[in-house]
A protein has these predicted regions:
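Register position in tetratricopeptide repeats
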Residues: 4, 8, 42, 75-76, ...
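Conserved structural position within tetratricopeptide repeats
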Residues: 17-24, 54-58, 87-94, 124-128, ...
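Helix-start (N-cap) detector for alpha-helical repeat units in TPR-like alpha-solenoids
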Residues: 29-31, 63-64, 96-100, 134-135, ...
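Alpha-helical adaptor scaffolds
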Residues: 68-80, 84-128
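Terminal, low-structured helical/coil segments at or just beyond the last alpha-helical repeat
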Residues: 146, 150-177
Length: 177
C-alpha cells in the first residue's frame, strides 16, 4: 500500500479489504464487524459503517457501539434514527464522557432542525455535567445567534475559546461577526 498526499485513508481501505477477505474465507471473530464499521467510518462510508456496526451490535451491545451508529446515521443525514440511538445511550449509560458527546450530538441535530428549546436543554445538561465543555458553550452561542441575541452569542463563543483556544466553530463565528 502506498500513501501519498492525495490518499489519506491511513490504511482503512486495506483494513476493509482484508477483513472482508477473512470473513469470506470463513474466519470467525467477534470483533471483525466492529473493526469493519470503524474502517468504513474512516473512509466516510456511513451506510456501510452502519451495516457493519449493526452486525456487531447483534454480537455484543455496548454504549460506544450505539454512539458510533448514531454518529454514522447523523453523517448519512438520517437524524431520526440517530436521535433514537442517542437517547438509548443517554438513558442507559453511566460514562459521563459518552453522555456528554451524545448530548452534544443530539443538541446539534436539534439545532439543524431549528428546535432551539430542546437543543438548549441538551447543551445545558452537558454544562451541568461539565461546565468546561467548549462544544456546549458554542452550541448555546449558536442558539443565541439564531434568536438574534448576538451579544450573548459572542460571550458564549468567547467562553468556548477560553476553554479550547482552537475551537473551529467559535473561531469562525467570532471572525465572521
Amino acid at each position: 500500500f502506498y500513501k501519498n498526499t492525495v490518499s489519506t485513508y491511513y490504511y482503512s481501505d486495506l483494513s476493509v479489504k482484508y477483513l472482508n477477505l477473512a470473513k469470506e474465507n470463513g474466519y470467525k471473530a467477534d470483533d471483525i464487524p466492529e473493526y469493519l464499521g470503524l474502517s468504513y467510518a474512516a473512509l466516510e462510508m456511513p451506510m456501510e459503517s452502519i451495516s457493519a456496526f449493526s452486525e456487531a451490535l447483534l454480537i455484543r451491545e455496548s454504549d460506544t457501539l450505539l454512539f458510533s451508529i448514531a454518529e454514522q446515521y447523523y453523517k448519512a443525514k438520517q437524524n431520526s434514527a440517530s436521535k433514537q440511538y442517542l437517547h438509548r445511550v443517554i438513558q442507559n449509560n453511566q460514562d459521563d464522557e459518552l453522555v456528554q458527546k451524545s448530548r452534544i450530538l443530539l443538541g446539534n441535530i436539534y439545532l439543524e432542525e431549528k428546535d432551539f428549546e430542546n437543543a438548549e436543554k441538551e447543551f445545558n445538561n452537558v454544562l451541568l455535567i461539565n461546565k468546561n465543555s467548549a462544544d456546549a458553550h458554542y452550541g448555546v452561542g449558536v442558539i443565541y445567534e439564531q434568536q438574534g441575541n448576538i451579544a450573548k452569542a459572542r460571550a458564549e463563543w468567547r467562553s468556548a475559546l477560553k476553554i479550547q483556544v482552537n475551537h473551529p466553530g467559535a473561531l469562525k463565528k467570532l471572525s465572521d461577526k
